């Protein structure tokens, strides 16, 4: 999950049925190898450009060959790239990143720090690197002291950030000043921002033996698991979007799986995967939310009733619009469905995946838009043909290298074994590589439904490394060794790792 704002501070450059027990189709051949190699090449291309023009800053500006520091100036792209470099077994890049992480002083930044973004990118990236390099990828780094620094730096970062939870309720401030221990004076915090800390902070406690980090994040989460007042939960498991920092009470009952709400639901089932013993309540709340979503939020465009999207709900009114960010939902249903052995949830997840696939396959670039709608009464005049054909119209045509659609394709491939989903990942990757690639990296697009994507955004988000290229690679990697399979999503309840919302694999507690 990433917050949906597109108030970008960058320059514009230029204008089915599930088959849970199916055999994995054989793509262990030259085609699979060449696809995996192509994704690795894209990763190396983006890394080389970042290293040459932007390192150790946060992100590359891939058109002007400049750099940005939107994530505190600690080298977000490097930390976000670590777990992908590990699963690609690129020892050279892994060592470059480890050497950089050892030098970061997390106590120093002139920026306002986002507790949420810093947790999912930096803390998640380092904890994942530690879990992978202490486990199935231990052979990549012989000097274990370099790996140990990852946990030391994770603890340092947790200690620097934890004052954010020092509020009357324990619901944290998100936008904080780590030098003054101040904050932005916000009265509320968002559902996803509050509810997408618990995996990383619990893992930090489990690895260090210090329970404080888990206690802080789980105290904040407790208000989400037991929402008050009752109007905050219009349907079982589906809850409002904003929480009063002083009281822990919800201030609304607006329900969605869109950005700002999304990864709260994502982490409910993932916490159960992480540790079924401690987090059974999280599972129950996720099941309630999933079942309520099927009953109350499932929506079918009038022009394409075969498609299924999730609507929003607020005070008796439904909103028929969604986002690229929300397209993680199919993968989340698939994960929950396979872990809980619920065929109905798997089938619904596949329906969501199919609909989000349409948002890619029906545009001129083959890439999906930032946001889209399917309200038959609100179709723009110049998009009526698109709506009739595809079942949606574009509300915001930007693409900023988001991963969620490819992410759900990956889950569909892992859960069903059906090769069409693998092919969908490849087709999406080819479209991104064709349309977004620059001489030094990858740029965002202003309009996915315009020739060549319209204009370009001069920014390469760190989640290109962490998510897009990781999911594309894992879908096509040949799992020749049991160790290499360990970090993959598994059918059933045999997962050894669970991905945080930035696609960093975190080792589950009981393995």
UniProtKB/Swiss-Prot annotation:
UniProt-annotated binding residues for Ca(2+): 501
Signal peptide: 1-18
Glycan attachment positions: 90, 177, 433
One BP annotation, GO: carbohydrate metabolic process
Entry's Gene Ontology cellular component terms: cytoplasmic vesicle lumen; endoplasmic reticulum; membrane
Keyword Disulfide bond attached: yes
A Pfam cross-reference name: Glyco_hydro_47
Location of the active site: 370 (proton donor)
Cofactor note: Ca(2+). Can also use Mg(2+), but with lower efficiency.
Any coiled-coil regions, as ranges: none
E.C. number(s) listed in UniProt: 3.2.1.113
Keyword match Nucleus: no
Main localization, broad class: cytoplasm
Disulfide bonding pattern of the chain: 327-356
Cofactor dependence: Ca(2+); Mg(2+)
GO molecular function terms noted in the UniProt entry: calcium ion binding; mannosyl-oligosaccharide 1,2-alpha-mannosidase activity
Location(s), subcellular: Cytoplasmic vesicle lumen
Subunit structure, interactors included: Monomer.
Entry similarity comment: Belongs to the glycosyl hydrolase 47 family.
Stored PANTHER family: MANNOSYL-OLIGOSACCHARIDE ALPHA-1,2-MANNOSIDASE 1B, MANNOSYL-OLIGOSACCHARIDE ALPHA-1,2-MANNOSIDASE-RELATED
Role summary: Involved in the maturation of Asn-linked oligosaccharides. Progressively trims alpha-1,2-linked mannose residues from Man(9)GlcNAc(2) to produce Man(5)GlcNAc(2).
Name used for this protein in its record: Probable mannosyl-oligosaccharide alpha-1,2-mannosidase 1B
Organism listed in the record: Aspergillus clavatus (strain ATCC 1007 / CBS 513.65 / DSM 816 / NCTC 3887 / NRRL 1 / QM 1276 / 107)
Lineage per the UniProt record: Eukaryota, Fungi, Dikarya, Ascomycota, Pezizomycotina
Gene designation per UniProt: mns1B
């Amino acid at each position: 999950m990433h917050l949906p704002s597109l108030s970008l501070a960058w320059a514009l450059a230029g204008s089915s049925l599930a088959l849970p027990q199916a055999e994995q189709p054989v793509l262990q051949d030259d085609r699979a190898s060449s696809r995996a190699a192509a994704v690795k090449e894209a990763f190396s291309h983006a890394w080389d450009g970042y290293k040459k023009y932007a390192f150790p800053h946060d992100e590359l500006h891939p058109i002007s060959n400049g750099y940005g520091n939107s994530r505190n100036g600690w080298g977000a792209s490097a930390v976000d790239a670590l777990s992908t470099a590990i699963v690609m077994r690129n020892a050279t890049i892994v060592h470059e990143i480890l050497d950089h992480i050892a030098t970061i002083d997390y106590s120093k930044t002139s920026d306002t720090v986002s507790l949420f973004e810093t947790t999912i990118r930096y803390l998640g990236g380092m904890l994942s690197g530690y879990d992978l390099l202490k486990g199935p990828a231990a052979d990549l780094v012989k000097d274990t002291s370099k790996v140990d620094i990852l946990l030391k730096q994770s603890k340092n970062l947790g200690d620097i950030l934890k004052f954010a939870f020092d509020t009357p309720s324990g619901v944290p401030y998100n936008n904080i000043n780590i030098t003054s221990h101040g904050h932005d004076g916000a009265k509320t915090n968002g559902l996803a921002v509050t509810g997408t800390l618990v995996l990383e902070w619990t893992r930090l406690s489990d690895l260090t033996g210090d329970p404080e980090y888990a206690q802080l994040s789980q105290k904040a989460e407790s208000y989400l698991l037991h929402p008050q007042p009752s109007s905050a939960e219009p349907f079982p498991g589906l809850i409002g979007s904003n929480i009063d920092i002083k009281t822990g009470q919800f201030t609304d009952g607006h329900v969605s799986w869109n950005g700002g709400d999304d990864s709260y639901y994502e982490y409910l089932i993932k916490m159960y995967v992480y540790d079924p013993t401690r987090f059974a309540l999280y599972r129950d709340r996720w099941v309630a939310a999933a079942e309520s979503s099927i009953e109350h939020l499932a929506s079918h465009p009038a022009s394409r009733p075969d498609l299924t999207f999730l609507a929003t709900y607020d005070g008796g009114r439904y909103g028929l619009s969604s986002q690229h960010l929300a397209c993680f939902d199919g993968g989340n249903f698939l994960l929950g469905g396979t872990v809980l052995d619920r065929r109905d949830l798997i089938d619904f997840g596949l329906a969501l995946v199919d609909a989000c696939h349409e948002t890619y396959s029906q545009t001129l670039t083959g890439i999906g838009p930032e946001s889209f709608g399917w309200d038959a009464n609100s179709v723009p005049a110049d998009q009526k043909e698109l709506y009739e054909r595809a079942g949606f119209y574009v509300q915001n045509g930007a693409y900023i290298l988001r991963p969620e659609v490819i992410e759900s394709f990956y889950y569909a491939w892992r859960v069903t074994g059906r090769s069409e989903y693998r092919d969908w990942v490849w087709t999406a990757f080819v479209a991104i590589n064709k349309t977004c690639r620059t001489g030094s990296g990858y740029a965002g697009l202003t309009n996915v439904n315009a020739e060549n994507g319209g204009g370009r955004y001069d920014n390469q988000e760190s989640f290109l490394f962490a998510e897009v290229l990781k999911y594309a690679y894992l879908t096509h990697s040949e799992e020749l060794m049991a160790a290499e399979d360990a970090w993959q999503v598994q059918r059933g309840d045999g997962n050894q790792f669970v991905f945080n919302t930035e696609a960093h694999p975190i080792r589950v507690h009981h393995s």
